[in-house]
Design a protein with these regions (language model features):
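A charged, well-structured terminal subsegment
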Residues: 102-119
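General small-molecule cofactor/ligand-binding pocket signal
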Residues: 4, 78, 100
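Active-site donor-binding loop signature of nucleotide-sugar glycosyltransferases
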Residues: 16-18, 102
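Amphipathic alpha-helical interaction surfaces in cytosolic regulatory modules
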Residues: 20-97
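A short, terminal or domain-edge coil/loop segment
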Residues: 1, 95-107
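Flexible, glycine-rich phosphate/dinucleotide-binding loops
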Residues: 12, 84, 106
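Short beta-strand/loop segment at the start of cytosolic alpha/beta domains
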Residues: 1-15
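Conserved catalytic submotifs in the C-terminal HATPase_c
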Residues: 8-9, 48, 104
C-alpha cells in the first residue's frame, strides 16, 4: 500500500492507495499513532484510491480514532469506493466513524461551525 501524506491548514491528510490489510496495517497504524504522539489532533484519511480493506485495516482506523478522541482530536474519513464503504457499513463502523463523501467535505468539517462534524 502506498500512503501519500499531506498537511493542509494544520490537518494531517493520508491518501491511501492499494490494500489496507494484515500486511500493511501495522505500518499505517505506526504512522498514525506517531503523528498523534507528536501532537496531531486533526486527521483526514482519503480512501479514494483504496481498493481493499480488511478487518486489520478497520482496527487501525478505530484505534487511531480512539487515540485522537482521548486527545480531544478529530478524524474524518472520506471518498470511499463502494466496496470499501460497504465493508464499513456491514461492520457497523459507519455509525461509529465520521465518513463524508469528498475531501472538500472533510476539510469543511474542520472549519468552525461548518460541516456535519464541525465543533
Amino acid at each position: 500500500m502506498e500512503i501519500i501524506e499531506e498537511n493542509q491548514r494544520g490537518i494531517n491528510i493520508y491518501k491511501l492507495n492499494g490494500h489496507l490489510d494484515s500486511n500493511t496495517s501495522l505500518g499505517f497504524e505506526n504512522k498514525l499513532i506517531q503523528a498523534i504522539d507528536d501532537g496531531s489532533k486533526s486527521m483526514i484519511i482519503d480512501f479514494k484510491n483504496l481498493d481493499y480493506i480488511s478487518s486489520a485495516g478497520l482496527r487501525v482506523i478505530l484505534k487511531a480514532t480512539k487515540a485522537l478522541k482521548r486527545e480531544d482530536g478529530k478524524i474524518m474519513l472520506c471518498d470511499m469506493q463502494d466496496y470499501v464503504k460497504e465493508v464499513f457499513e456491514i461492520s457497523g463502523f459507519d455509525s461509529l466513524l465520521p465518513i463524508v463523501g469528498s475531501m472538500g467535505d472533510a476539510l469543511d468539517a474542520f472549519s468552525p461551525n461548518r460541516g456535519p462534524y464541525g465543533k
